[in-house]
Amino acid sequence: MEELICREGTVHSVIFQNAENGYTVLRLLTEEGEVVTVVGCIPCVAPGEHLTVTGTWEVHPQHGEQLKAQELERTLPEEEEDIFAYLSSGVCKGVGPTTARRIVDRFGLETLDILEAEPERLQEIRGITAKKAMEIGELFRQHMGLRRLMEFLSRYQLPPVLAIRLRQQYGDGAIRVVEKNPYLLSDDVCGVDFSVTDTMALSMGFAEDCTERLEAALTFELTYNENNGHVFLPKDKLLAATCQLLSCGIEQVEAALDALAEHHAVVIQRIANVEAVYLRRLWEAETSACARLLALLEMDADESRFADRTVAEIEKEQGITYAPLQRQAVELAAKVGVILLTGGPGTGKTTTVRGIVALFQKMGLNIVLAAPTGRAAKRMSELTGMEAQTVHRLLGMTWNEAAHQVTFQKTEKEPLEAEAVIVDEMSMVDVSLFSALLRALRPGTRLVLVGDADQLPSVGAGNVFSDLIRSKKIETVFLREVFRQAEQSAIIRNAHRVNLGESPDLKGNQGDFFFLCRRDAQRAVATVLELCKTRLPDNMHIPAEQIQVLTPTRKGPCGTINLNRLLQEALNPRTPGKREILWGERVFRVGDRIMQTRNDYDVVWQKDDGTVGTGMFNGDVGRIAEIAAGGEWLALDFDGRKAPYSVEMLSEIDLAYAQTVHKAQGSEYRCVVLAAMPSAPSLMVRGVLYTALTRARELLVIVGDDAAIRSMAANDRQQKRYSGLKWRLCHAGDASE
């Protein structure tokens, strides 16, 4: 066992501090005059503080001997010069060395107490107004509150960045709130894993059978399964999973579930032969979506008089002749209020949508086009010649901090002006977003939902597009014919082969489709890097920024985590003068391709033409345009939408040189390099391979194991998603409803 070393002294300087995890490198000046390098989780530390550090020596290859902290005692500075160093270090914005010196000269050892408790006394110093005094006091009070909260969390090995979210939600009382019920940390605000909060709560003395623990575990299981696509869970599965999580009896858990139902936190309803348990917001989304969709289906929308003559006019104007199913879809748009249009690549969905748009224009309707992601909306605009926007922006999605939930400007109280709405990439739309869209439609609005039912389902809960099709309650057109021009593309031919359960043709040069067999993961990684850095740019004249690497998984040699690190080194290496920020174990550098990984409704962005808006959404892709000299902020550019991000917001983004196939849904790239190696069984399925192939527009290069690819094509297993939408549509009007 290594000998524990103890050193006591004053923080001389902070060399490095990671805002996300609190990892810090500092210089400690001991009373003997020794300067010791200390490393460890020491959040919110500043020069002048007094530390007692217990740990072990380690030798860093570049920085030499350093003390790795295992235990830590810290106190605020108690000497005037230490107080000056602390105050002038930046702990209180707006107080630099000059102002700090004047404050310490006036108040001496009482300085920190006065700043926190009696900031109005700062007016005793010439040049500090009443307003300035209160501003300094408030900033210092916030700093001290955040410091105490970080110290509290660090005792339970919780990341310091969590303190920012807790303080935003609960203010000065955050510690009291967490002490009263630590299980709140596993809610939507903080998202801490239940096992972590459970360990914390039990160490604080909470009983194993306490109400807080039982209810938190049930909610955690429902939320966890929501994140895996389920709208509800069967009651027996929920109870079994929760009992296993808690190692307790079913009677206690069932009583807690009944209590949650009484408090309206969950809804229990029989769906077919299943007793379904919903989080209340998901139950409301599903039932509302069903009711509003049925109302649209019941409206009298028959404008058959337009159909035959108008479709013929459109064909003449556009210089085309529709295939029978395309004509059927365009005519249906005039006859019914809601239609579904589905088909794979090359089957003419875009041509059909253009025809429906032309039809609605001739009917004099106000038309709105939308898609789930910014890239899908941009592509929809390019293909139709009309403006399209994301569903989120169409509905005016914002974040209500007080209620801690998403809200929409467009609802039944303030509906959209549109008389016809066309939504593309419907397979990506989850039940909550679909419900919000329907709430914003006026009675009588025509609705056209377009997508590819064979692609992966939405990341969010539900299987909306598939449920709508399988209900057989809505007029649906299946485009199956691959047109001659599209048939010339090996990408499209192979995508349809995969969709039929056949392996793609992996032999030879097929023009826009190449396969490079690599059965060793490290060789596959090396090939992917070579393709992106030299072979494709040099031989195919495709710039690296137009190449997207896709992979089924995040983990492993061919996962996004490893590939992004290596691709960043290859395509955007560290160079003198290029700024970068270390965030956790990741480096973000000017020029990096990045992706928004969770919705942020408050981000303010601006375009070059002066257009201003708010909100960045999960899956938005951009690049780092600038990093401030001090590293306190970044400027990000998302396809022309430029937004400032604080360092704390780096938890919302990730590198995007490589993306998972799921994340790439709704996007299309000039060139796709697919790393296809054996992975988790749930990812080695046909839907993942099919979705990956259909992301490539001009060139697809598959690098990987041919046996794994054939296995994926043959495996049509789909993960079951618990959803009641299809059942509700089919049983509308039943007494059980």
Question: Which sequence ranges carry the predicted segments?
Answer:
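Pre-Walker A segment
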Residues: R270-P345, T351
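Conserved helicase motor core of SF1/SF2 NTP-dependent helicases
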Residues: G355, L359-L365, A371-L383, H392-N400, ...
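Conserved helicase motor core of P-loop NTPases
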Residues: A453-G615, A625, A732
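C-terminal accessory regions
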Residues: L500, N618-E737
